[in-house]
Amino acid sequence: MTIQVLNGPNLGRLGKREAAVYGSVTYAELVSLIEAEAAVLGVDVQVRQSDSEAELLGWVHDAADAKDPVILNAGAFTHTSVALRDACAELSAGLIEVHISNVHAREEFRHHSYLSALATGVIVGLGVQGYLLALRYFVASASS
C-alpha cells in the first residue's frame, strides 16, 4: 500500500508563512516527519505539494486509479474547488482531510469544506501531527 499525501497551495511555504497559525515546521521538515513515520509503520508514502489545482487534480486521479488511500491538505482549494471535490469522489481506498490550523476557529469562509462529506475522516487544528495520525489510521484500518 502506498499512501498518497497531497498538499495544496501555499503549503510549500510552511515555516515562512504565518507561523502563529501554521507553526514553525518547514515543508521540508514536514516531509521528513511523514517519511520517518511511514518507515516506522512499514508503509510506502508519496508526499507531494503543488500550488496548481490542475496538478493536484491529476494526483488525485492517479490515486483513484491506483486505489491508493489519500491524506489531503488542499489548503484554500478545500473551500473553493468543486473540481477537486469531484475528483475526490472517485477515491475508493479512503480520504483523510487534514488541516494544520483549526479552520473552524478562523475566518467564516474557511468553515465550509467541499471535501469533508466525502472524507473517511477530518483532522483539523492538531498541527503537523494531523498527518501522522492520518497515516496511523490508514495502517491500522488496513490491518484490521
UniProtKB/Swiss-Prot annotation:
Q: Which residues form a coiled coil?
A: none
- Determine the domain of life of the protein's source: Bacteria
Which is a GO BP term held by this UniProt record? amino acid biosynthetic process
* UniProt entry keywords in alphabetical sequence: Amino-acid biosynthesis, Aromatic amino acid biosynthesis, Lyase
Q: List the disulfide bonds.
A: none
Quaternary structure (record): Homododecamer.
Protein name (Swiss-Prot/TrEMBL): 3-dehydroquinate dehydratase
Species:
Mycobacteroides abscessus (strain ATCC 19977 / DSM 44196 / CCUG 20993 / CIP 104536 / JCM 13569 / NCTC 13031 / TMC 1543 / L948)
Annotated gene: aroQ
